[in-house]
């Protein structure tokens, strides 16, 4: 999972390095419209924090990269995580942000339901209090006549909150599937795997809410091995080639592989 892919040129760059998924930051204006693909300062060590595009322009380029037959098509790119920077919004704007985000995606990515981009989408929300963004998103797609597109949409609360609190937020949001649980910290700092293991245990329990667990931001071979040993489903990185190298090591290549479009990202993998 390629981290902080905010310029159109970076889509090709990260997929060519081995990423089958990218993460893109989405900033909002004061009226809760998705405005830019932009992270800003501070960001990960050894990365330029200020690359950006207008959100709708990025979506159009992403559509080309994920539409079979297009000259820019990458068969390998199957999942996009939108890191929604909702910290600039009031809590009562969350539903509006979801509606406006859905309409932008419908028009510019899904091409109004007519042979749009095929990648699966994860809406990653940093604040549990913004759970109404999910209902707003679903409501907009339904009112625009495309509720079937929700089959392509999953969810993540990215604030490293207590697993029980995250479960309650999903209950409030009415979400019962398509859940990716993230855990992590900037590559400038160290973070243990305790919460990852709790998320994995939730995923593997009979009554958990988690379908997939991913860990960020992992740039070193040893931390990649540690995350794989903990049982994660995905690893977000600034260096997709490092992850690909580790997956080819004898200890891992029989147990893990890069997911393809035929793999269901909402289905919990049972080994």
Curated annotation (Swiss-Prot):
Q: Active-site positions, per UniProt? A: 3, 39 (nucleophile)
* Disulphides: 43-49, 45-188
Q: Which cofactor does it need?
A: Mg(2+)
Compartment(s): Secreted
* Glycosylated position list: 248
For the protein in the UniProt heading, the enzyme class is: lyase
Which controlled-vocabulary keywords does the entry list? Answer: Cytolysis, Dermonecrotic toxin, Disulfide bond, Glycoprotein, Hemolysis, Lipid degradation, Lipid metabolism, Lyase, Magnesium, Metal-binding, Secreted, Toxin
Kindly give the Gene3D superfamilies that the UniProt entry links to this protein: Phosphatidylinositol (PI) phosphodiesterase
Q: Which GO terms describe its cellular component?
A: extracellular region
The GO molecular function terms of this record are: lyase activity; metal ion binding; phosphoric diester hydrolase activity; toxin activity
Cofactor binding description: Binds 1 Mg(2+) ion per subunit.
Tell me the tissue specificity: Expressed by the venom gland.
Q: Which family does it belong to?
A: Belongs to the arthropod phospholipase D family. Class II subfamily.
The identity of this protein, by name, is: Dermonecrotic toxin LarSicTox-alphaIB1c
Source organism of this protein record: Loxosceles arizonica
């Amino acid at each position: 999972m390629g981290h902080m892919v905010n310029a159109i040129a970076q889509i090709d760059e990260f997929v060519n390095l081995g990423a089958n998924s990218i993460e893109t930051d989405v900033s909002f204006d004061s009226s809760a419209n998705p405005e830019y693909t932009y992270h800003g300062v501070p960001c990960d060590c050894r990365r330029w924090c200020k690359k950006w595009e207008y959100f709708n322009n990025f979506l159009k380029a992403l559509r080309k990269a994920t539409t079979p037959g297009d000259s820019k098509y990458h068969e390998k790119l199957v999942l996009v995580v939108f890191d929604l920077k909702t910290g600039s919004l009031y809590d009562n704007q969350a539903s509006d942000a979801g509606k406006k985000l859905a309409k932008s995606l419908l028009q510019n990515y899904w091409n109004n339901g007519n042979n749009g981009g095929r990648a699966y989408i994860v809406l990653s929300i940093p604040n549990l209090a913004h759970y109404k963004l999910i209902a707003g998103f679903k409501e907009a797609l339904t009112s625009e006549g495309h509720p079937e597109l929700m089959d392509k949409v999953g969810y993540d609360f990215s604030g490293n909150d207590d697993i029980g609190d995250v479960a309650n937020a999903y209950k409030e949001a009415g979400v019962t599937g398509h859940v990716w649980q993230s855990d992590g910290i900037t590559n400038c700092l160290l973070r243990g795997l305790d919460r990852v293991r709790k998320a994995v245990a939730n995923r593997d329990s009979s009554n958990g809410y988690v379908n997939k667990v991913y860990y960020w931001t992992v740039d070193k071979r040893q931390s990649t091995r540690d995350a794989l040993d903990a049982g994660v489903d995905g690893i977000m990185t600034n260096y997709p080639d490092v992850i690909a190298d580790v997956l080819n090591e004898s200890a891992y290549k029989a147990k893990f592989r890069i997911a393809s479009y035929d793999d269901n990202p909402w289905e919990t993998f049972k080994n």
